[in-house]
Amino acid sequence: MNIYFCGSIRGGRQDVVIYQTIVKKLQQYGNVLTEHVSYDSLSDKGEDKDGDKAIHDRDVQWLTMSDVIVAEVTQPSLGVGYELGRAVAMNKRILCLFRPFSGKVLSAMIRGASAKPLFQVQDYKEDEVENILEEYFETLTKN
């Protein structure tokens, strides 16, 4: 299974430790095409060696190849929002993870999209994320 993980890069790297936990867990279920999002070495300046167009085209190709999208959406990010919009247009299965106790409010464009059958938003606390992913992928493999 190809898994596309979305997390903030240029929007801020405050949640990189959570991204690492999520990606490590996701690797139990398949190939995480975007594991680099969880790297400590990736700054909020992002990747720059190949340029923005190359990054965009590569990431859209990975989205196309993906069986499921998992996004940590607590840290607002234009890029993550764009990726989610493209994934919805491709009819991909999407799980968005949000920490309401962060003091942030999730965009209505994300929370409101969860009325679609393939789009799910799950509120969580950090110590719950691995169990949430286990439950999601158990259900996914049964269907």
Curated annotation (Swiss-Prot):
Locate the residues binding 5-hydroxymethyl-dUMP. 7, 9-11, 77, 79, 83, 107
- Which keywords does this Swiss-Prot/TrEMBL entry list? Cytoplasm, Glycosidase, Hydrolase, Nucleotide metabolism, Nucleus, Phosphoprotein
Q: Does the keyword 4Fe-4S apply?
A: no
According to UniProt, the reaction catalysed is: 5-hydroxymethyl-dUMP + H2O = 5-hydroxymethyluracil + 2-deoxy-D-ribose 5-phosphate
Gene Ontology cellular component terms for the protein in this record? cytoplasm; nucleus
Any one Gene Ontology BP term: nucleoside salvage
Q: Which InterPro entries does this UniProt record tie to the protein?
A: 2'-dNMP_N-hydrolase, DNPH1, Nucleoside_deoxyribTrfase
The signal sequence is none
The answer to whether UniProt assigns keyword Zinc to this entry is no
Origin superkingdom: Eukaryota
User: Where is this chain's protein located in or outside the cell?
Assistant: Cytoplasm; Nucleus
* UniProt cross-references to Pfam families, sorted A to Z: Nuc_deoxyrib_tr
Q: What is this enzyme's EC?
A: 3.2.2.-
Could you give the subunit structure recorded for this chain? Monomer and homodimer.
The record's similarity note reads: Belongs to the 2'-deoxynucleoside 5'-phosphate N-hydrolase 1 family.
What is the documented function of this protein? Part of a nucleotide salvage pathway that eliminates epigenetically modified 5-hydroxymethyl-dCMP (hmdCMP) in a two-step process entailing deamination to cytotoxic 5-hydroxymethyl-dUMP (hmdUMP), followed by its hydrolysis into 5-hydroxymethyluracil (hmU) and 2-deoxy-D-ribose 5-phosphate (deoxyribosephosphate).
Name-wise, this protein is 5-hydroxymethyl-dUMP N-hydrolase
Species of origin:
Danio rerio
